[in-house]
């Protein structure tokens, strides 16, 4: 999350983590749940960041569906915020998507296979 804008009238909160295929209601609910959990646990805020965040060595969100699925399934916060039925439902959807992806033969694999013959 970051504040962006050049004047008090144009300042807004931005979260560029969710993908374009996210359910916006679930994304906002997750952000609120995470914020409330941080407040309840009295977690300290990180210092304000300046510079290019893409070059920062700070914590990262999962970069693959497989690693995101593992984090989602193991998240006590997600289960508390959404309930186990919702977590399990979306986890199953991710597993189905991963199975379809794993079964696909890509152009790279075909090309590489022909190179090796």
Task: Go through each PLM region and give its residues.
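Catalytic-core signal marking the mid-to-C-terminal active-site face
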Residues: 1-117
């Amino acid at each position: 999350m970051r504040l962006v804008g050049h004047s008090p009238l144009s300042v807004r909160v931005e979260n560029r983590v969710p993908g374009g295929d996210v359910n916006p209601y679930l994304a906002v609910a997750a952000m609120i749940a995470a914020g409330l959990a941080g407040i309840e646990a009295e977690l300290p805020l990180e210092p304000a960041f300046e510079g290019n965040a893409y070059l920062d060595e700070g914590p990262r969100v999962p970069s693959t569906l497989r690693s995101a699925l593992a984090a989602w399934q193991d998240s006590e916060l997600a289960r508390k915020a959404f309930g186990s039925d919702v977590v399990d439902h979306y986890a199953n959807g991710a597993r189905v998507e991963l199975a379809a992806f794993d079964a696909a033969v890509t152009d790279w694999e075909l090309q590489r296979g022909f190179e090796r013959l």
